[in-house]
């Protein structure tokens, strides 16, 4: 039986539900990347490292809620804390103490988090970070990296997918005040930034491209960018929505010796609930204070109806509290497992792949025509994406291993070395058929 027929035979219930979903939802989904061919399975439940679909199929999950569930699905400390909060209400629309509890943990782990604001998504967090930078500097130009993904805010939806000179979407105006720099190319980046002159407000960059291919930034590259922007009176904004609390208890920038002005957080810090965090130095964040700043000179960060709701704040504090308590065991273990995954997959597939990532994140790129190391999003886009999708669908169908097809994998505290061995065996079987 061919792969697609085998998948369809195992997921008939999902097929029926997804056909119904297409009657109500554009493309059948509410997030573009959740669709994959021939159709996505429909999840019934999740616990620990497992997803269970409506047909009863059980999967070891490496997607882990868009990489946000570092403790696994529904971990007991988070579940217990949230259940207690739900008995007291989940949105009040007023100030709650749970917000302070989470902020205290973040400040203790993130050196630049002198002040914090909460929103409900990473998109909002980075959008507001850009606004803060413009208001603080009085400048207009925002620079991002080619392949950098910062959510769907119009001003930053630029140069995300190759080819970079083609607009990412209809409905966008020409964003003349947003520019893009080549990731991991310091000389090329400084050339672009230099042409912005004295109107450069900030550079927004990820320490590891998440959506762009799970590609770490060279530390010398990041330090060179920081030195340049600070010498020009501009700000360094780090998008650590993927990397924050992923490799260590805190942010990735600390290991590189960076001193950002603003950091955007999300995913892990919400404990599996919707969150976006803008945090930064006092002198930058203060401009958003509507009590002390008039309309004409403030950066308006209003939040939203559900921002800093007590359910999310409770979940986030519980998740970070558990990570803090177990940081001496969780991080060394899952980072080591990630190192092993990159090493073993590289050996299994040989020169057919470039396996990227850092710590507990990894991604297999099937390179074409003997291309070498994948070091930026353009390199990733030149790989055989269709083969990667087939590899992932093969493991979903035949091995009960779930990667969102085409995306990176995230190892959680719920995974074991035995899980990795099962993935290696599945990969060896797939490699033999190439």
Curated annotation (Swiss-Prot):
Enzyme class: isomerase
Catalyzed chemical reaction(s): (S)-4-amino-5-oxopentanoate = 5-aminolevulinate
A molecular function (GO) term: pyridoxal phosphate binding
Protein name (record): Glutamate-1-semialdehyde 2,1-aminomutase 2
Xref: Gene3D superfamilies: Aspartate Aminotransferase, domain 1, Type I PLP-dependent aspartate aminotransferase-like (Major domain)
Biological pathway: Porphyrin-containing compound metabolism; protoporphyrin-IX biosynthesis; 5-aminolevulinate from L-glutamyl-tRNA(Glu): step 2/2
InterPro entries: Aminotrans_3, Aminotrans_3_PPA_site, PyrdxlP-dep_Trfase, PyrdxlP-dep_Trfase_major, PyrdxlP-dep_Trfase_small
EC number, as in UniProt: 5.4.3.8
CDD domains to which the protein is assigned, alphabetical: OAT_like
Record family assignment: Belongs to the class-III pyridoxal-phosphate-dependent aminotransferase family. HemL subfamily.
Keywords assigned: Cytoplasm, Isomerase, Porphyrin biosynthesis, Pyridoxal phosphate
Species lineage: Archaea, Nitrososphaerota, Candidatus Cenarchaeales, Candidatus Cenarchaeaceae, Candidatus Cenarchaeum
Residues found modified as N6-(pyridoxal phosphate)lysine: 267
GO CC, one annotated term: cytoplasm
